[in-house]
A protein has these predicted regions:
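Feature marks short, highly hydrophobic, charge-poor N-terminal signal-anchor/signal peptide-like helices
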Residues: 1-12
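Short glycine-rich anion-binding loops that position phosphate/pyrophosphate groups of nucleotides
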Residues: 232-234
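Conserved catalytic-core segment of NTP-binding enzymes
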Residues: 187, 204-222, 236-345
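Cytosolic-side junction of a single-pass transmembrane alpha-helix
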Residues: 16-31
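Short juxtamembrane segments adjacent to a transmembrane helix
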Residues: 27-52
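Primarily NTPase-proximal linker/entry elements flanking Walker-type ATP/GTP-binding cores
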Residues: 43-229, 244, 254
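Short beta-strand and adjacent tight-turn residues that come in two discontinuous sequence segments
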Residues: 33, 229, 293
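Short beta-alpha junctions and helix-cap segments that line functional grooves
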Residues: 3, 19-20, 161, 277-279, ...
Length: 347
């Protein structure tokens, strides 16, 4: 009997070692998706950070705009025609560029100098992009539903939003309702540990609505201030996606009257006009209250922000300008336009 017990104990130890190794490997894989904290150094002002993030887009616009606005004389129609072509080339989109130019045409008299047209363009962009900032939580729990296709940085954005709320002293709970992608749950777990947030998740393949229900029950029991709900991003199954989002919203509204208080759509700026198509599809499935535009620092397609705003009407509320936690910034229309054009408004 004694040898049998020894073998049994050895086998049990081996199993435990294997399980520990698997869990550690999964945690390491998830951790690679979490950006590092900013290195020590001087604090970069939000406007400067945005200017750096839009450098590629600005570089793409600078030479064509100088050609358009640097000309002497008052041929407004020629200036506007060339301006429209430049805007389309910056991923503002054909329809949005045309509408923007039409509004500028109404603001400037015929024979106006190119500098006057430039000022009018800036003002029209500011007015188009202006919107309400993300609201401060005013009830408890404050529920935020976050949508977006896989690969846009949705789960990372949720982690960074959690960090922002934690910096404001709020208790945060993350709900891993993207049960079709195991890595999403693991990644949220790493973020929860990193920023000091609670986490509710179930095994892969679970019913997302059940996960949300459990999360809201936990939020009420633990006196959580903010609940951030991750969702699946399977845009290729459009009908199922819409129905799933509607179901999640019904569960949320039933458990927390008036919720979701925010419905954020995360879009990847590097995808250009594809981001506009995604925005259109998601806005059909749920009312979008705000847009998060990620990866602005890695693309020359920053003009897509203007196209998305006009397409679905929802305000841009955050922009992603890098990998660090501090690189998710509240959106400011004036700062954005200044960064896009490369300086303060013309005198």
């Amino acid at each position: 009997m004694e040898p049998s017990w020894i073998l049994l104990a050895a086998g049990l130890v081996l199993v435990l070692l294997v399980v520990a190794w698997v869990l550690r490997s999964r945690a390491r894989r998830a951790a690679t998706s979490v950006p590092p904290a900013a290195p020590p150094g001087r604090v970069v002002a939000p406007g400067e950070r945005l200017r750096r993030g839009l450098a590629a887009t600005r570089q793409r616009l600078t030479a064509p705009l100088e050609s358009v606005f640097g000309r002497a004389g008052g041929d407004v129609e020629r200036t506007l025609g060339e301006l429209e072509e430049v805007l389309v080339g910056a991923d503002v989109g054909v329809a949005t560029a045309g509408a923007l130019v039409a509004r500028v045409r109404e603001r400037v008299p015929s024979g106006a100098e190119a500098s006057a047209v430039r000022r009018a363009v800036r003002e029209e962009m500011c007015e188009l992009l202006a919107g309400t900032p993300a609201p401060a939580p005013s009830s408890k729990p404050w529920v935020v539903l976050v949508m977006g296709v896989n690969g846009v940085g949705k789960t990372t954005t949720i982690g960074k939003l959690a960090a922002l709320h934690r910096q404001s002293g709020r208790r945060v709970l993350l709900v891993a309702a993207d049960t079709f992608r195991a890595a999403a749950s693991d990644q949220l777990a790493v973020w929860a540990e990193r920023v000091g947030a609670d986490l509710v998740r179930q095994r892969p393949g679970s019913d997302p609505a059940a996960v949300v229900f459990d999360g809201l029950q936990a939020a009420k029991a633990r006196a959580i201030d903010v609940v951030l709900v991750d969702t699946a991003g399977r845009l290729h199954t459009r009908t199922n996606l819409m129905e799933e989002l509607r179901k999640l919203r019904r569960v949320i509204a039933r458990e927390v009257p008036g919720a979701p208080h925010e419905t954020l759509l995360v879009l990847d700026a590097t995808t250009g006009q594809n981001a506009v198509a995604q925005a259109r599809t998601f806005s059909e499935a749920a009312t979008v209250t705000g847009v998060v535009l990620t990866k602005l620092d890695g693309t020359a397609r920053g003009g897509v922000a203007i196209a998305v705003r006009r397409e679905i009407g929802a305000p841009l509320q955050y922009v992603g300008l890098g990998e660090g936690v501090e690189d998710l910034r509240p959106f400011d229309a004036r700062d954005f336009v200044d960064a896009l054009f490369g300086g303060e408004a013309d005198a």
